[in-house]
Amino acid sequence: MTRPIGIDLFAGAGGLSLGFEQAGFDLVAAVDIDPIHCAAHKFNFPKCATVCKSVVDVTGDELRRIAGIGKRDIDIVIGGAPCQGFSLIGKRALDDSRNQLVHHYVRVVMELKPKYFVFENVKGLTVGKHRQFLKEVIEAFQNGGYDVVTDYRVLNAADYGVPQDRRRLILMGARKGLPLPAYPEPTGRTTVGDAIGDIPDAESFPELWERDWVKAKYGKPSTYAAYLRGKKDDPTDFGYRRQFDPMLLTGSLLTDHTELSRQRFAAIAPDDVEPVSRFKKLALNGICNTLRAGTASDRGAFTSPRPIHPTVPRVITVREAARLHSYPDWFRFHATKWHGFRQIGNSVPPLLARAVGGQIMKALRKKPEKPSEMLALGDQSLIGISMTDAAAMFGVSSTVIARRSRPVDRPAPRRHEERELVTA
């Protein structure tokens, strides 16, 4: 079986990668500048070449060589390039140095000459002065030999089975002469209760003050949760199966709250915002607010604001956030809360990516097939690796990502020990 192939630029931990794999593609290379993200991608995608580099410094020929695909036609290039600024009057926004990552995304697409591309970004690119920048991006693709779906859309992941309000611009294009893809039709909604209702309360396990995993007995899953736990076959998932223990609860390192915080969390009604912390309390029959990545190093490197659990007076865990983002339970994130939430908050929900990938598959006129091969996940050390060790492993500087000015969270000390309390 020969599956269509793709390359993910700005891959992060792999939300787009996973969604397109589930749509029937083989991701042959993934590029990201962050060694921690690259380590997670390497762990979760053992068949994909991980390239820890800025897209500014990579070429199409280099990616072909690393991926081992020679001159084979690439079916899809995907990616969400950050854009930091907009130009003064009289200067093209795409030429602005602050937007060089978008410029180089376009460049690498031109060098690789895939049949299709998908450019994902914030919905803000579609409003006000930002639309001029988006127009320049579209023109750059058109001048490079691509037709673009100019009636671009902002898609809400909640319309594609993700229990989260998350709106993203999806821009799609095809090499001239190939049919343009259509946008996916909504597939229905999933609730918070569907997503996390079967997960046992992390605070029932003292081990989770020291590490992020434990063997646990789960409750009765919804269909959504059964798919993510691997307890039921999802007929729309054409990705590789992974070897993992479905009784393992991962990504569940606990957060210690003051008693006052717990009282406030318990008192607030579902779907309301707790006034002191400004955290939203989730409702079992609702959807989650947008999960974010937290602040950068130059802004204090704070962990992202996390919603309050709907039935327990605490914030949600990384695993609960992953469920709300449509990641399967075999998918692992960094063991620390800061990196784990950063990886989720920076990523495209796999179910949204799968819906888009399915439309590219239709445009290719190919029928997706489920591989029979089951993949072993990577070495466990990749999940707890430090930035210094991750950088050394990939042969890059440990300062390629600005250092966190606050210590990365470590396993929480026992309650009788001195600890940093979350009072927000």
Curated annotation (Swiss-Prot):
SAM-dependent MTase C5-type domain boundaries: 4-367
Superkingdom in the source lineage: Bacteria
Molecular-function GO terms, alphabetical: DNA (cytosine-5-)-methyltransferase activity; DNA binding
Keyword Transferase carried by entry: yes
EC number annotated for this UniProt entry: 2.1.1.37
Reaction catalyzed: a 2'-deoxycytidine in DNA + S-adenosyl-L-methionine = a 5-methyl-2'-deoxycytidine in DNA + S-adenosyl-L-homocysteine + H(+)
CDD domains: Cyt_C5_DNA_methylase
Gene Ontology terms: biological process: DNA restriction-modification system; methylation
Annotated Pfam families: DNA_methylase
Residue stretches of biased makeup (Basic and acidic residues): 406-424
Region (Disordered) location: 404-424
Name under which the protein is recorded: Type II methyltransferase M.XorII
Active site, UniProt feature: C83
Function: A methylase that recognizes the double-stranded sequence 5'-CGATCG-3', methylates C-? on both strands and protects the DNA from cleavage by the XorII endonuclease.
Protein family membership: Belongs to the class I-like SAM-binding methyltransferase superfamily. C5-methyltransferase family.
InterPro entries, sorted: C5-Methyltransferase, C5_DNA_meth_AS, C5_MeTfrase, C5_meth_CS, SAM-dependent_MTases_sf
Keyword Glycoprotein: no
